[in-house]
Amino acid sequence: MTVNTIPNVISGLKLRRSELDIQLLLSSNQDLVKKLKATELDAIIVALNETTQDDDFEILPMFSDDIFLAVNKDSKYADFKDIDLSLLKEETFLTLTKGFATHNDSDIIFKKAGFSPKVALQVNDIFTLISMVSSGVGFALLPGRISAVYESSVKLIPLKQQYHMQQEIGLVFLKSKERDPNLLALIAECRMFASNFKR
């Protein structure tokens, strides 16, 4: 999201409210939700799942994103049209640490495939994970939104239908702050992004 979604939203927000001081925090869903609940953050853009289901939260869905198998460009799987994940039982995988939505989604997909992956490394940021995949250290399950930046070094292969998984990405904020003018500007910008994304 820090590659495309967030920069687009922030540039639009700065046009609306140039005086706004924006600070970004890159972290797991779990950590960001906790900080939002404690009012340490005004709003978060995250994968919408059980961590974001809270009566205190207002949610604005923005877009959906498929999960893919990410492989090095030279991988023997790089030319596959789609992949049956159960064929990769003996392969080495890399994952994000617990608390990240993509980690949780990966667990669900591996369970559907009937195996626990051999995990060589768990990292706490997606950029390190992608870098490791591009270096051939292992494979990963990653959202399609990373492809725009890493298409020269990482190939994203669709999962066969039985393993298909989508992440719903959205803006989450506290209902108690929904009248804040800065937050209203952010909501408007996220709505604009969502409507442009669907075109």
Question: What spans do the regions from the language model cover?
Answer:
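N-terminal winged-helix
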Residues: 1-17, 21-25, 30-33, 178-181
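Ligand-binding cleft/hinge of the Venus flytrap
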Residues: 9-18, 103-116
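Secondary-structure junction motif
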Residues: 77-78, 91-113, 179-187, 197
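Beta-alpha-beta core module
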Residues: 54-60, 65-66, 127-175
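Short beta-strand-to-loop elements that line the ligand-binding cleft
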Residues: 20-27, 116-125
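Short beta-strand-centered segments that line the small-molecule binding cleft or hinge
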Residues: 8-12, 30-67, 71, 134, ...
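Flexible hinge/capping segments at coil-to-helix
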Residues: 56-67, 71-93
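C-terminal effector-binding regulatory domain of bacterial HTH transcription factors
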Residues: 15-17, 104, 144-151, 162-199
